[in-house]
Amino acid sequence: MSANSGVKRASKAFKTCLFCKRSHVVCDKQRPCSRCVKRDIAHLCREDDIAVPNEMPSQHESSPNDNNIQGKYANKAHTGIPSDYQNEPVNKSGSTYGEELSPKLDSSLVNDTTSLLLPQQPVFVSENVGSEFSSLNEFLSMLENPLLTQTSLSSSSASNVHLENGSQTTQSPLEYQNDNRRDEIGVARQENRSPTIMSGSSNSISKGDKQDQEKEESRILANANENSAPTPKEQFFLTAADPSTEMTPEHRLKLVINAKLEAGLLKPYNYAKGYARLQDYMDKYMNQSSKQRILKPLSTIRPAFRTIARSLKDVDLVLVEESFERMLLSYDRVFTSMSMPACLCRRTGEIYRANKEFASLVDCTVDDLRDGKLAIYELMTEESAVNFWEKYGSIAFDKGQKAVLTSCSLRTKDGIRKRPCCFSFTIRRDRYNIPICIVGNFIPLS
């Protein structure tokens, strides 16, 4: 090389060789340079012949080739279509700046330009790459989560609208990957929400099923109660309240007593409680002489009653109570048809039936005169009560006498007023000749 060329190479643009320039190091002025000699490429060491211009050409002074190249790359960068510059022959007539390129630099410059312009674009990539996998993932997610079906349908309908309007846009591979990532994130969020939604819906479904099951069970129980036969106690009340007149009174009495016996309400009466009640009343409201007069006849008849009762079995005592119930039912009809004050009481004095005339006479209700709530001696004066028990004791075991006519003085329930009456009572006996009840009739004297 000439000296003039060495002087020219003293400038900064031609100071280094081609390989030192690529490595961004400063080489010496010897050719081949010491660095290329060490790398065993002394035969390739040469200077870079590309002259660096002082000014870059302006935008308006760019060549038509530059405009074509820039337009091509800009268009392909926006559309996402892979560049086909590698299939086109390289124009060797001029460089980008209007200078000739050596054949050895063509491929390197083209590769450098390609790496700078399209660093992230794959070569020969179709715009539909991965679409089949995306469709498959979307289909599987729809099968696993039915809640996403509506979302996918709405998105597909929106895409159909864009296609019909002719506004189809082309996505680059990078944008396509970002969209797929966003779709996967949305699906993951929806799947995270779906267990809560499904658990809430399952809880509501389980609660609804439980409520329906409870309603069904209550309905079945109600139907069973309606269809089931009444209990023995209910059957007794239904039979006793039946106003049927098609059967004879004897047959009706038999039905009522049998129903009460089956209900367990027909039991032997404990007369010891009745005598204890009488004893308490005498201790509270009677003097000693009156008590002795009452206890004298009772001391005679009570041992006789006790002796007979001990010889009887429980079945016999139940039959005695059955006969008493028969008398109660028969006297209900009798008391309703008569206008004379009357009542029916046990041999211990507890009143079990009475008519409304007797209730008005002693100033109380008919219900107060039922089932032993009041006793006959509690509605009499002290002298009248003593007279009653003496008369009763005298004929209790006398089969030839069963009725007594005498006088008494009744008093109201509150004990304020007195009602003098003509009094007659009749003793009814059972099959064992034991007094079972006392029926009294009263005629007021004033």
Curated annotation (Swiss-Prot):
Phosphorylated by SNF1 in absence of glucose. The phosphorylation is required for induction of transcription of gluconeogenic genes. Pfam families: PAS_13 (PF24990). The modification Phosphoserine is found at residue 102. It is found in: Cytoplasm; Nucleus. Its main location: cytoplasm. Transcription factor which regulates the expression of genes for gluconeogenesis, the TCA cycle, and glucose metabolism. Involved in the cell wall remodeling process and drug resistance. SUPFAM superfamilies: PYP-like sensor domain (PAS domain), Zn2/Cys6 DNA-binding domain. The modification Phosphothreonine is found at residue 231. Residues 178-192, 207-218 have a biased composition (Basic and acidic residues). It comes from Saccharomyces cerevisiae (strain ATCC 204508 / S288c). Disruption phenotype: Sensitivity to ketoconazole. This is Regulator of drug sensitivity 2.
